[in-house]
Amino acid sequence: MSPATGAQHRGGEPAHRRGAAPAIRLPATEHTSRPWRIHELTRDFRLEDVWALPAPGGPSDFPRLVALMATADPSQGSSRVARALWTTRWKLGELLGWDGPDAGTGSRVRTLRDRLPAGLRDGPSGPHHDALPFISLYLTQDEWAAETANRTMHGVLHVSWVADRSGGYRGQMAVLVKPNGLLGAGYMAAIRPFRYLVVYPAMGRQIERRWQADAGNPPPATLSGCT
C-alpha cells in the first residue's frame, strides 16, 4: 500500500530520457508523492500506471490539455493495430454485456462524486468526455479526474499539470482501477501487454500531434477559469 494514497501499485518503471518516446511511463512516486486531491477518493483503488504526456507548456496551459484529453478518441488514431484492439474491445463488451447501463456508476458501483469533500463538490466538475464513457469528477487549476465503470472494473483517469526541471510544465496522467472480482483481475492482466505496447504509445502520438497543432489556441471558455 502506498503511504501517500493507500492505493496499491503494480510497480512503475524508471522514467526514460525526455524525447525517447511520445509517452513515458513514470515511477509510482511521480503520482503518490504529490498532494493531489484524488488521493482522498481512491484509497481502495490500485494505481495501475503513471505517464508523462508529450504536452509541455506554461503555468496557464492546463485548461488546453484538459480540453484535448476530453475530446481525444484513441479508437480513431492513426495506428491500425490500436484501432483494431478498440473495435474488438467494444464488440466483446456488447457481446458479453460488459458495458450495459446496469454495469456502470450509479448501478453496479457508487459514483466517486459521493466521496467528494465540499470544496470539490461545489466546484467545477470538468468537461464531458466526447468519445469514451468517462464522467468528470472534479476540475482544479492542476487536476482533472474522471471515472468509468463496467462489468470488469471501476476506473479513474487522473490528468495533472506538473512543474518540470526546465522551469516549465508538462502533462501527466495516472490510471487507477478497482477490478471487479476474478473477471476484472483476469481482464486487466490480459490487456496489460496490449496497453503498454500498442494503446498508450498510439495515444501518446495522438496527444503529441494535437498538442502541437493546437499551440496558441485558447481553451474553451468553460475551462479557462479552472479554480
Located regions from the model:
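Hydrophobic ligand-binding cavity/cleft-lining segments
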Residues: 2-123
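Glycine-rich loops and low-complexity Gly/Arg-rich segments
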Residues: 76-79, 161, 171-172, 185, ...
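Short C-terminal domain-edge/linker segments immediately following a structured domain
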Residues: 82-85, 175-179, 202-209
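An exposure/low-complexity boundary signal
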Residues: 106-127, 132, 217-227
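Hydrophobic-ligand binding "helix-grip"
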Residues: 121-165
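Short terminal or interdomain "cap/linker" segment that borders an active site or interface and mediates
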Residues: 143-145, 153-156, 165-166, 170, ...
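Beta-strand/loop substructures that line and gate deep hydrophobic ligand-binding cavities in soluble
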Residues: 150-189
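A conserved amphipathic terminal alpha-helix motif
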Residues: 187-218
